[in-house]
């Protein structure tokens, strides 16, 4: 699906992961809301090198995924013209991390940016989510980052050993 840029006329920007959800959610929220998709993760560890600062508390060095530059720049433009930006990524550690990365990329304050979650895409569930926002759960973000860092460390260290074993 093509990302079609346009000027945001709505007061609120809601960012979801999946474009399939955006039209239905927009229909439930009405004209004061624009709903756009991030198409999943917008940043990741670099493809070259480890991308983890081991000396600095295993700090991950995230980079914008090349295929997400356009999406992020459009979300940034729309967010800047909205009165409020809402994070509505999936309610799991991946979704929480995606929301946190988006908030950081858009220079939104993670302590005050409304985070909404819903378990079904119904008018009632969406309206309840908007009435009861929370903030990004940094415990879930930390859990996802720990998993991502461990995946990279194990993969980075094991790959050469595995390749040597495969070749012999």
What do these predicted regions represent?
Residues 3-164:
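Intrinsically disordered, low-complexity regulatory segments
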Residues 166-168:
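Catalytic and ligand-binding motifs that coordinate phosphates/metal ions
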């Amino acid at each position: 699906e093509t990302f079609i840029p346009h000027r945001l006329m709505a007061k609120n920007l809601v960012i979801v992961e999946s474009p399939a959800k955006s039209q239905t959610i927009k229909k439930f929220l009405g004209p004061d809301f624009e709903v756009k998709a991030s198409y999943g993760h917008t940043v990741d560890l670099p493809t070259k090198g480890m991308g983890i600062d081991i000396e600095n508390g295993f700090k991950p060095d995230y980079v914008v995924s090349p295929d997400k530059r356009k999406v992020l720049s459009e979300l940034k433009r729309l967010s800047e013209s909205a009165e409020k930006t809402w994070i509505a990524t999936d309610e799991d550690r991946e979704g929480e991390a995606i929301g946190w990365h988006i908030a950081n990329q858009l220079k939104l304050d993670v302590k005050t940016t409304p985070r909404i979650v819903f378990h079904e895409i119904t008018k009632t569930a969406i309206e309840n989510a908007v009435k009861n926002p929370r903030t990004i759960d940094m415990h879930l973000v930390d859990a996802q980052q720990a998993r991502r860092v461990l995946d990279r460390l194990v993969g980075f260290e094991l790959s050469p050993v595995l390749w040597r074993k495969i070749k012999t």
